[in-house]
Amino acid sequence: MKQYNPKEIESKWQNIWEERGVFHASNDKDKEKFYALIEFPYPSGQGLHVGHPRPYTALDVVSRKRRLEGYNVLYPMGWDAFGLPTENYAIKNKIHPKVVTEQNVARFKKQLQGLGMSFDWSREINTTDPEYYKWTQWIFLKLFEKGLAYKKEMSINWCTSCKVGLANEEVVNGGCERCGAEVVRKQKNQWMLKITEYAERLINDLDLVDYIERVKIQQKNWIGKSEGMEVDFEITGGKKITVYTTRPDTLFGSTYMVISPEHPYIEELAAHIQNMDDLVHYREEAAKKSEFERTELVKDKTGVKIEGIEATNPATGKQIPIFISDYVMMSYGTGAIMAVPGHDTRDWEFAKKFNLPIVEVVSGGNVDEAAYTDTEEGIIVNSDFINGMQVKEAKEKISSWLEEKGLGKRKVNYKLRDWVFSRQRYWGEPIPLVHCDCCGWVPVPESQLPVLLPEVESYEPTDNGESPLANLRDWVETTCPKCGGKAERETDTMPQWAGSSWYFLRYTDPHNNEELASKENLDYWMPIDWYNGGMEHTTLHLLYSRFWHKFLYDCGVVPSCEPYQKRTSHGMILGENNEKMSKSRGNVINPDDIVTEFGADTLRLYEMFIGDFEKSVPWSQNGVKGCRRFLDRIWKLQEILVDSQEMTKELEGNIHKTIKKVTEDYETLKFNTAVASMMALINDFYDHGTVTKGDMKTLLTLLNPVAPHITEELWEVLGFEGHIYGTTWPIWDEAKTIDSVVEIPIQINGKVKGQMVISVDFTADQVKEQFRNDERLMALVEGKSIVKEIYVPGKIYNIVVK
């Protein structure tokens, strides 16, 4: 028997699979399809780390199993290669982003191929390929044509390091999601996408899909639907300020108003305002703060009272003061709030600081001491005609009253904001629009797509916030497609999220030059049957791609309103000390090192055996070694092989149980228990002393999705017909998974004293008879009289003695 040599057999089988196109999906519409998808990676300079193979292997296991079950499986791979990380790396190391991308993709691909993933490499895509981003640009033009892409002067999140505008979703704890640098507010003309137009459908259609519950909850919370009232407050100067509130029942408790420092009424009412200089100074200070700093709950409350104008509370008719404060943002609601300090902590703290009245309107607390916020239920007080009502009844009553008086209207609001789509950087898809003084913004004709990203020597971001492309006058200056006059190209580029918002569609028809993908292929392959990805992308990529897909559905391009039928997520792999892997901690594990020392099958097996797939788990080098020993034991089963195509009779029940367990566990992401059941079966084979060819074929087929190289090699070495990739998945016999005997505990006066093996069919009388016929067991009650006996079928035999 040859020694197990992973290096030799793994490269051999990887070459065979690729040369024969074993994992190439066909467009044979007569076969039932299975489209498995993992998030395509950003190819970083560091290459793969051991966290990458975990989700890749998981869906590889499912894909390999589904192929053996007869499905036409599409399991593709590509590269999300545009974006800030590549550009920042290129600037730092003085290498062009295009060169960086090519080098990184080549390294990533080599690493992935070395892991034996069953990707269909014939469908490989790259978001930086002009033949790919041609269709990203095409989708943008469709959004523009439908009025869902618009340019607007607005206050945006600005990363001080990347020098680029960020969407709200890209700001984490006041810092840039990519680099961690401070994020400030800056006025900028930006392209926006109206994702808010799809807010309701993005919530409702979650009922149509099989996502893990916490993903659905995160998406709903991010969209932030609320139902309330828009209420008009008359103010000095004959104007009205409209506020949005979900608690109109607390209107009688509104003792002051707060508006955003950027509110346009400040300029419009300047003639009435007596302390304009104070307001302008406060606004300048607020502009220096990020949105995170401004809205942080624990920060000190600051503000300035607007002298010279007041508002009228429409419920009480009383005059109330108006303040500006940085915790109110123009980008949320109407840029104004009615403050109810009795029942809102932030309003209460503000009222205390500025010595403003605090009125209790929902009974239950002591508003002199703190805001009473447990007000979802309760009795209304100090509120005139809604006094004594429950909160729910009071909401309805005052809402109707406001509508009747023309003082307000019911409104559904969303926390979700439109998507900031411009990036003032080089390494991204050019936005296919030109600006003409006569015609405004004009789309580049589809026949001229793609608008190629020009080759440049200097791609550093500019200090004035313009894209590096703005300096390329030969490229910028062009002709208006509409009137033939002078025009200039848009110099902002798209965000990294653009290419990843539709990539899964291109996999269905990656070489199509005439359309995004053929209707025939989209109708066959979509929607995706199973998509696995990180929880960190729930409010970014997952939301954006669902939005684009719904838009394309409305355009008649795709056949389904949702792109992903099922979405699962995986836990991180941590360092051995339970800390997140990072270069600074020196605990990063390179998968190449594991493959070199132990083999790809060992790495794959370990990552599936390491623990609950959905939870984060620490790396263990000893665990890796244990998995290698397990594969060695499988290899050595050759030594006890006997020439029989039947299953070992004595182990037949265990084999059928293992088939059932592995089949079900692979589909429910319980890879660790599936592997454990195969380990137990191998122990049975060694304990028995022989393994038949029938046993071996079953074991190798079950293990193949996890450890494909060693199983294919053993299949060939043992002279079995064909290859595992051409065989069929084993089917268990349910009758053979049921034990004919069971071991039950014997409990005497409440304490377990022994065990007995009985037939599963035994009645209580038969159990009693077997107990009395066993001298060893009868010794447990010797000298005592049996008072009572209770048999719980298949579970326990209780005896009471005295």
Curated annotation (Swiss-Prot):
Disulfide bonds: none annotated. A motif ('HIGH' region) lies at residues 41-52. GO terms for cellular component: cytosol. One of its GO terms (molecular function) is ATP binding. PROSITE patterns: AA_TRNA_LIGASE_I. The keyword Transcription regulation does not apply. ATP binds at K583. It comes from the Bacteria. GO terms for biological process: leucyl-tRNA aminoacylation. It is found in: Cytoplasm. Signal peptide: none annotated. Its EC number is 6.1.1.4. InterPro entries: aa-tRNA-synth_I_CS, aa-tRNA-synth_Ia, Leu-tRNA-ligase, Leu_tRNA-synth_edit, M/V/L/I-tRNA-synth_anticd-bd, Methionyl/Leucyl_tRNA_Synth, Rossmann-like_a/b/a_fold, tRNAsynth_Ia_anticodon-bd. It is an enzyme of class 6 (ligase). It catalyses: tRNA(Leu) + L-leucine + ATP = L-leucyl-tRNA(Leu) + AMP + diphosphate. The keyword Nucleotide-binding applies. A motif ('KMSKS' region) lies at residues 580-584. Keywords: Aminoacyl-tRNA synthetase, ATP-binding, Cytoplasm, Ligase, Nucleotide-binding, Protein biosynthesis. Belongs to the class-I aminoacyl-tRNA synthetase family. NCBIfam families: leuS_bact. This is Leucine--tRNA ligase. It comes from Alkaliphilus oremlandii (strain OhILAs). The lineage of its organism: Bacteria, Bacillati, Bacillota, Clostridia, Peptostreptococcales. The gene is leuS.
